[in-house]
Amino acid sequence: MSFNHKTIEELHDLLVAKEISATELTQKTLEDIKSREEAVGSFITVSEEAALKQAAAIDAKGIDADNLMSGIPLAVKDNISTKGTLTTAASKMLYNYEPIFDATSVANAYAKDMIVIGKTNMDEFAMGGSTETSYFKKTKNAWDHTKVPGGSSGGSATAVASGQVRLSLGSDTGGSIRQPAAFNGVVGLKPTYGTVSRYGLIAFGSSLDQIGPFAPTVKENAQLLNVIASSDVKDATSAPVRIADYTSKIGRDIKGMKIALPKEYLGEGIDPEIKETVLAAAKQFEALGATVEEVSLPHSKYGVAVYYIIASSEASSNLQRFDGIRYGFRADDAKNLDEIYVNTRSQGFGDEVKRRIMLGTFSLSSGYYDAYFKKAGQVRTLIIEDFDKVFADYDLILGPTTPTVAFGLDTLNHDPVAMYLADLLTIPVNLAGLPGISIPAGFVDGLPVGLQLIGPKYAEETIYQAAAAFETVTDYHKQQPIIFGGDK
């Protein structure tokens, strides 16, 4: 018997009633991972021994009836530090790295007696939109194994979509939670910048990165955010704001809610069928009592250019620490210190990571800083101001998560610009530090379409309220791929 169709609340009730034990649930989850892993390749590391040991300890002390997450398995993206467990960021550079500490988000999960079942595949150092830049393997879409799962958190999304786990953690720098959530038909949230501590997250773009949850439903996503969100003295960018319960507005109606639909989000480059899906969703929100009106975000069209200057510049700085001296990969053909640095970085980083380091180094270099990095920061401010103007009059922004459905494996990984444009609709949210969610909203050619809801800072409760209301009048979140036992 598999438990992967049961919600977290249903699993909790079974655990409290002692109809199953944490050990049995963990064993079944491990079986689900193993039976599907060859098809989708979601995991870099499966922590079987450690997970079963933790489950046995939870069983020994007993399930806490007041702790919803007690005994629940969790998959964690492989750029989030886990003490004593490989944390590779899907890079040769960190192929043997075992942290001596847990990321705060992982520590928060352990504090709630969650069981870390394994580490999921991703684009190397979270740089990519297809999980094809991983040093270890290419993850495949849960709905069509010839398509990409999205990225960079492709393994975390596919693990949930394929029924390997119920919950997972990812990170989002320019869409890396929302895009794979859309491609795999699950719920993925990028919280407000600073809501979840970045301590223990292997840094890519420090002003953009944010850890967030994946789940099959809106409520379960909010329940996981309740666990991982916290203020943290170990993270200087951690926000002091802490919502008591992110599920508090789920179930409320949305009558009177004002939702903005930017005309730029349905313009050039957006698949016509995705546009139709979003417009149909807008009608659903109106039927639920919300007002949906067209607005403009005029500077959003510059988002991709701004993002790749800022993110690459921050990456070139953050990745300077990987030099073969203290930990990780070291080239064995070096004859002096200079060759250790050069050979280690040349051999340890993949092509996409090296491309971004070079772009970032150029943008920060003397003579080009003002023309590129400084200018990008100025345009970023204009993008933020556009959002501020809209949120002065509206509660949420609605639009597609991605311009297309999942594309084929090995189709865009040799065309960096085309790959970058796949994040066209998610990037502005990171630049502004806003919360955004992707929820299942339909299908095009048998592949899931994601609907994105964006809110002002710390409006996760309102986002969840609207997203959950949409779930009540649609069944897209209930449809599952064949690998999960569905009929698609």
Curated annotation (Swiss-Prot):
Gene (UniProt): gatA
Keyword Glycoprotein: no
Gene Ontology BP, a term: translation
SUPFAM superfamilies: Amidase signature (AS) enzymes
InterPro entries: Amidase, Amidase_CS, Amidase_dom, AS_sf, GatA
Similarity annotation: Belongs to the amidase family. GatA subfamily.
Protein name: Glutamyl-tRNA(Gln) amidotransferase subunit A
Keyword Ligase on entry: yes
